[in-house]
């Protein structure tokens, strides 16, 4: 454990940020999984809503630095491709 006051504060702050980041990432992954489950069921209406939510979560994570902006873009592209495939059929 740190002895210096500023190091103690940094350790506390770091732990809080870690917990917050973990919950944000978890929410992002959950939104993606919900979307993919709806794609499996071929529920176009709900899948469109879930796609919007998942896209927002990905954008938010990218803007906060949780994931790289190109990684978010790639994920959104793949989700959009899945959505388009069920809309076409």
From Swiss-Prot:
Region (Disordered): 1-25, 69-89
Keyword set, alphabetical order: Ribonucleoprotein, Ribosomal protein, RNA-binding, rRNA-binding
BP term (GO), one: translation
Entry keyword annotation includes Metal-binding: no
Biased composition (Basic residues): 7-20
InterPro entries: Ribosomal_bS20, Ribosomal_bS20_sf
SUPFAM superfamilies referenced in this protein's UniProt entry, alphabetically: Ribosomal protein S20
GO cellular component, one term: cytosol
GO molecular function: small ribosomal subunit rRNA binding; structural constituent of ribosome
NCBIfam families according to UniProt: S20
PANTHER family membership: 30S RIBOSOMAL PROTEIN S20, SMALL RIBOSOMAL SUBUNIT PROTEIN BS20C
Family to which this protein belongs: Belongs to the bacterial ribosomal protein bS20 family.
The protein's role, per its UniProt record: Binds directly to 16S ribosomal RNA.
Protein name, as recorded: Small ribosomal subunit protein bS20
Organism: Geobacillus thermodenitrificans (strain NG80-2)
């Amino acid at each position: 454990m740190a002895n210096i006051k500023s190091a103690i504060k940094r350790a506390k702050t770091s732990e809080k940020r870690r917990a917050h980041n973990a919950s944000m990432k978890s929410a992002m992954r959950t939104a993606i999984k919900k979307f993919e489950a709806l794609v499996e069921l071929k529920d176009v209406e709900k899948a469109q809503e879930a796609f919007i939510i998942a896209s927002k979560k990905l954008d938010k994570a990218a803007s906060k630095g949780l994931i790289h902006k190109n990684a978010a873009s790639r994920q959104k592209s793949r989700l959009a491709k899945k959505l388009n495939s069920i809309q076409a059929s």
